[in-house]
A protein has these predicted regions:
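Hydrophobic alpha-helical connector segments
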Residues: 76-109, 154, 160-164
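Helix-turn-helix
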Residues: 16, 24-58, 62-66
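Short secondary-structure transition hinges
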Residues: 73-82, 101-141, 185-191
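N-terminal intrinsically disordered/low-complexity leader segments
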Residues: 1-12
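An amphipathic alpha-helix adjacent to DNA-recognition modules
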Residues: 11-19, 52-76, 80, 129-133
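Hydrophobic/aromatic-rich alpha-helical bundle segments in the mid-to-C-terminal region
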Residues: 114, 128-137, 146-200
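N-terminal hydrophobic signal/anchor transmembrane helix of membrane proteins
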Residues: 88-105, 193-211
Length: 211
């Protein structure tokens, strides 16, 4: 029977491997990362990744779920918060801001999230269809449901949704070296993300008011 100390050490090792895997996948993508590199980054024996997770594929899916698995549900539920014009605008702003959290990182977990998102979008893995279904579609539908409150025509609704999606996705598609080119010199990343969010939302609100 395992002692409490052994169980505790096992959990710590598992978490260290997950943290190392997140950094490795965010930096190198699925194909570029290796279990050996992940174990080296975690400072543990090279065999432990297989012991705790089985395969690199299983580890990648778990890391992706940790980053993106909890994102879709709250965004999909935003439409349920809307009771009037003010709450609709607040919900749309929350959606845009949360999406930019993934694609325009400032530090820490945001950078890892954005790195993984970038690699998966620009170099899709064999899990891409699964991720798109489980993580991407709920996020997209969350935006679409909000816009459907203002746009009745299906073609126009899809145009609005895909247009906003494209604006917030561009940072995921661009290499991080290009991010500075989009941002005025001297403006911090988080401040710029807030300005981008304001710009997109203000444009949407103004155009909706004219419609």
């Amino acid at each position: 029977m395992k002692t409490r100390k052994e169980r505790s050490d096992g959990q710590e090792t598992r978490e260290a491997l997950l943290a190392a895997a997140a950094a490795e996948f965010a930096e190198k993508g699925f194909e570029g990362a290796s279990t050996r590199g992940i174990c080296a980054r975690a400072g543990v024996n090279a065999a432990l990744a297989n012991r705790y997770f089985g395969t690199k594929e299983a580890l990648y899916r778990l890391v992706a779920k940790r980053f993106f698995g909890d994102l879709g549900a709250p965004l999909a539920a935003l439409a349920g918060k809307v009771t009037d014009e003010a709450s609709w605008r607040a919900a749309l702003r929350e959606w845009v801001d949360d999406f930019l959290f993934m694609t325009l990182p400032s530090a820490g977990a945001q950078q890892l999230c954005a790195g993984l998102f970038h690699h998966e979008v620009t170099h899709p893995t064999k899990f891409h269809a699964e991720f798109k279904r489980d993580f991407g579609k709920p996020v997209y539908d969350g935006l679409r449901n909000l816009l459907a409150m203002k746009v009745a025509d299906e073609e126009q609704l899809e145009l609005w949704t895909s247009s906003i999606w494209a604006q917030v996705s561009v940072y995921a598609l661009a290499d991080k070296a290009w991010h500075a080119s989009f941002r005025p010199k001297g403006v911090a990343v988080r401040a710029w993300a807030e300005k981008v969010c304001d710009h997109i939302c203000d444009m949407v609100f103004a155009m909706m008011d004219k419609a």
